[in-house]
Structure formats: structure tokens, C-alpha cells
């Protein structure tokens, strides 16, 4: 299943941003190969695509695609992704290259191979380059990483990979080579102009500046047009306020995750200097369209 196409074969998908929420329930068979743009990307490429929808399935689940044998370039995920195994912000499993991609959506698994960008990079031709993850990655299984869950070949190229330092305990869950690494960055480092330069290493002009962290250059004309003053709990570069922010705030209030200082400012939607159930209730109403603005505590 996919937000745009279920099975892409010998085709190219470009310039597509999906905002479709997907829940696939297992009835008689596997509820697998699910993506925000394409369920499976076979001998096909995805370029300059994005996902803002929430996705829940069993395995091979990704913000862009669940499974790929083609390249993925210049893509991002801002949606919350949940599943069992092979769950990631960009692709569940790939045998080819993933380049210049980033993730800001929370990733939650219950099994093995879970990551912010690529859950499983399979084979010598798989590569992950110039990518970063800024969201929590959690699973009770093994091979869990902020950027890559697992590589199974020492020749798979991993370079210029970064993640926000508190989002996961390790950048790559299991690597076949000491050269396959990802580097932790602080929030201040990710928000800096220097980090934009770092992300553009070897591919000048691919990333541009946004309010919180590097965004892809094809996005920069849109960034800021939808930015509200409050509610952007996941610090999405576009400034979207949606179900992903509701879920992060819910997790914070029940003690499942921590929020950093800037996220707490965004979560305090009624500006009473306290993040609590009242903020969550208002955020839910805003996302549902019941209210069109956040009231101040003084109103």
C-alpha cells in the first residue's frame, strides 16, 4: 500500500508530497511493504518527494517506501511511522542508494531493523549518504539506529550521516565495517549555518536553511508559509501542525519521551508557561479544525 502508488515498477516518481494517513490491518496475509509515497519501489526511483502522513503497518514500512531496489534522492519524512520490523523514516529496506534525505517524524517499532532513515541497507550496492535524523527512534528489538538499523555488507557506502544526539542511543544499529558510522549532533549544531554546509558536502546547493535544521532546496520557497507561532512540537521545517505533533505531546505527557526546550515552547500552545493536558486538548482541537487559532491563557 502507498499514499500515491502501491507498486512502482520501472518508473520514476518526482515532486510528490503525500499527506495521507495510512493504517494497514492484517486480515489474511502480511500487512507489509507500505510507504507514504509508494508501497514498493522496484527498479524505480523517487526524487524530491515527501511524506507528512502517519503510517501504521506490520513490516517494511517507510515514509517514502517500504521496500526499494531503486534510488531515493532528495526526500523527507515528517510523519509518525509505526510498525513491527523494517520500519524507518525513508525506507524499510533498500538495495540501492538513499541520498540527501532527512526525517523529523517519530519512528516506533516493536521488532528488529528500525531506524530514522533506512531500516536495512542490504547488499554491496546499498548506500546511505548525506542524510540526517532529528526524531526519536524506538524499538524493543535489535538492529535499531538513529539513521540506519543494519548493514549486511562492508562495501555498502555510508557517509555524511548525522542524528540529533538524544533521539537514539546509536547512529547505526549494526554495521559490517568501522567506516559505516553516523555522528551525533546537538540541537544547536543542527540549527547552525555550518550544518547546512556540512549536509551539502559533495553536493553543493542540495540543502538550504530553514528555521530549525537544513531543508531540501526544493522546499525552501514553501518554508515559512504555513509556520504557526505555536504547536510545531516536532520542529518540522515547514512548520506544519498536525497529528504528528499531537502524538509527540501525548507521549511526553504520559512520560514515554522527553521534549527539548524549543519543543516545550511549541507545546505550550496556551502560553501559560506549563505544558499539560490543556495544551494537548487545544492541539487536538486545532488539528481537527474545531478551532483555527490557539487562545492565550489571558483570553
Stretches found by the model and what they are:
Residues 223-299:
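Cellulosome-associated attachment modules in secreted, modular CAZymes
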Residues 1-229:
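Predominantly extracellular beta-rich ligand-binding scaffolds that present long acidic/polar faces
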Amino acid at each position: 500500500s502507498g499514499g500515491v502508488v502501491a507498486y512502482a515498477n520501472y518508473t520514476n516518481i518526482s515532486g510528490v508530497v503525500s499527506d495521507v494517513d495510512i493504517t494497514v490491518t492484517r486480515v489474511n496475509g502480511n500487512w507489509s511493504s507500505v510507504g507514504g509515497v509508494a508501497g514498493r519501489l522496484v527498479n524505480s526511483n523517487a526524487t524530491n518527494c515527501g511524506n507528512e502522513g502517519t503510517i501504521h503497518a506490520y513490516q517494511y514500512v517507510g515514509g517514502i517506501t517500504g521496500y526499494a531496489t531503486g534510488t531515493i534522492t532528495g526526500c523527507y519524512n515528517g510523519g509518525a511511522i509505526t510498525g513491527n520490523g523494517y520500519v524507518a523514516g525513508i525506507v524499510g529496506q533498500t538495495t540501492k542508494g538513499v541520498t540527501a534525505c532527512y526525517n523529523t517524524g517519530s519512528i516506533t517499532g516493536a521488532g528488529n531493523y528500525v531506524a530514522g532513515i533506512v531500516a536495512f541497507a542490504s547488499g554491496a550496492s546499498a548506500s546511505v549518504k548525506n542524510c540526517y535524523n532529528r526524531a526519536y527512534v524506538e524499538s524493543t528489538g535489535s538492529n535499531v539506529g538513529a539513521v540506519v538499523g543494519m548493514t549486511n555488507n562492508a562495501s555498502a557506502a555510508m557517509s555524511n550521516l548525522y542524528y540529533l544526539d538524544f533521539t537514539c542511543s546509536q547512529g547505526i544499529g549494526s554495521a559490517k565495517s568501522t567506516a559505516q558510522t553516523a555522528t551525533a549532533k546537538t540541537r544547536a549544531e543542527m540549527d547552525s549555518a555550518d550544518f547546512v554546509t556540512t549536509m551539502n558536502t559533495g553536493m553543493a546547493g542540495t540543502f538550504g536553511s530553514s528555521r530549525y535544521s537544513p531543508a531540501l532546496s526544493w522546499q525552501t520557497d514553501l518554508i515559512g508559509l504555513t509556520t504557526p507561532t505555536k504547536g510545531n512540537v516536532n520542529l518540522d521545517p515547514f512548520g506544519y501542525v498536525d497529528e504528528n505533533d499531537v502524538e509527540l505531546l501525548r507521549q511526553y505527557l504520559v512520560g514515554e519521551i522527553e521534549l527539548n526546550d524549543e519543543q516545550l515552547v511549541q507545546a505550550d500552545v496556551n502560553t501559560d508557561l506549563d505544558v499539560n493536558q490543556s495544551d494537548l486538548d487545544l492541539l487536538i482541537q486545532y488539528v481537527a479544525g474545531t478551532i483555527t487559532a490557539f487562545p492565550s491563557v489571558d483570553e
